[in-house]
Amino acid sequence: MPEFSAPKGVPDYVPPDSAQFVAVRSGLLDAARRAGYGDIELPIFEDTALFARGVGESTDVVSKEMYTFADRGDRSVTLRPEGTAGVVRAVIEHGLDRGTLPVKLCYAGPFFRYERPQAGRYRQLQQVGVEAIGVDDPALDAEVIAVADAGFRSLGLDGFRLEITSLGDDSCRPQYRELLQDFLFGLDLDEETRRRARLNPLRVLDDKRPEVRAMTADAPVLLDHLSDAAKQHFDTVLAHLDALGVPYVINPRMVRGLDYYTKTTFEFVHDGLGAQSGIGGGGRYDGLMRQLGGQDLSGIGFGLGVDRTLLALRAEGKSVGSAARCDVFGVPLSDQAKLRLAVLAAGLRAAGVRVDMAYGARGLKGAMRAADRSGARIALVLGDRDIDAGTVGVKDLQTGSQVSVELDSVVAEVLSQLGR
């Protein structure tokens, strides 16, 4: 047994699995960048009050799942449990909302929630997110959703579905809240659930306990009580999704786990993951900017789970990314050859080729085994006789064929064989 291991619920990604992880993260990010979303890098931890106010004190995230601690200055800070609140804080702090709108940003990285670890549910989770802030336009809602859909499909994932609903606006939510509370207070709920019903009754509909879900099965749904404006907004979003060819299922009982969502709300679900079927989701948050001290601007965004997307691909028997660490592997047969190959490797790397080489006293057989394990397409075999002749052996590791190439022509030959 090793002396140290990763903390419970915190996964390591090591080769070759790490190549698939990186490919998933890159594929999801690239879909956002192609739609004009610029990269933003955020702190891993923030002032605890940012999440308490932004995410909602009645949510499980804030009340049960945050990693919160006092720093050496006795300030309460929290490892970020989600990305939107931090992005909104940065937009306000740096005045991005004073420029061209919408502000369109994308990001990726680790987020932290103290949950019971299981497949697809980690205490350190990896996400890709986008936020579009400053324009209340249903066409923008549809674009954000389409970006997520395109990201999943770019990876070859196809066994997922988009579930969507509307959580209404300020003109219809108060009346619905009263209606829902009247229904909930007529049930035989435990005291903690009744407390949540008083603070935010939608949270009760998000309860995962079977007995609570059974009791709330006939609860009124917000989709049946939308204002005219909220209904028109939702209908327009659906019309845009239809035009974009993005399939969806309307789920009137959907409740997201964060309090800031309004109007359009959505989730991507993959049934191959069992109980933890959500692979991403998001929605509109029209009051969050004002709530965090900024202008009264609307916003919409999503968070996609990199870990869960990788699990979903595996459930479909698919993989992405290459396990190969390099394109070319150097096999030196002497110390002098090692020096010359190091120079060749530098030239190839400058040309954009991934190059590794054998180190230590491996001998030819050991070095060639290392070349095979590396996943390289080409091996460069160099000995003292080759140096005297001014050549190097260029071996195709897929076919086994080998040719001698002049040292000055190696870069061009390798690029040609790699099809570049």
Swiss-Prot record:
For whether the record's keyword set contains Ribosomal protein, the answer is: no
State which Enzyme Commission number(s) the record gives.
6.1.1.21
Cellular compartment(s): Cytoplasm
Q: What class of enzyme is it?
A: ligase
What are the GO BP annotations of this UniProt entry?
histidyl-tRNA aminoacylation
Q: Which domain of life is it from?
A: Bacteria
Q: What are the entry keywords?
A: Aminoacyl-tRNA synthetase, ATP-binding, Cytoplasm, Ligase, Nucleotide-binding, Protein biosynthesis
Q: Record's family?
A: Belongs to the class-II aminoacyl-tRNA synthetase family.
Q: How does it assemble?
A: Homodimer.
Q: What is this protein called?
A: Histidine--tRNA ligase
Source organism of the structure: Mycolicibacterium paratuberculosis (strain ATCC BAA-968 / K-10) (Mycobacterium paratuberculosis)
**What gene is it encoded by?**
hisS
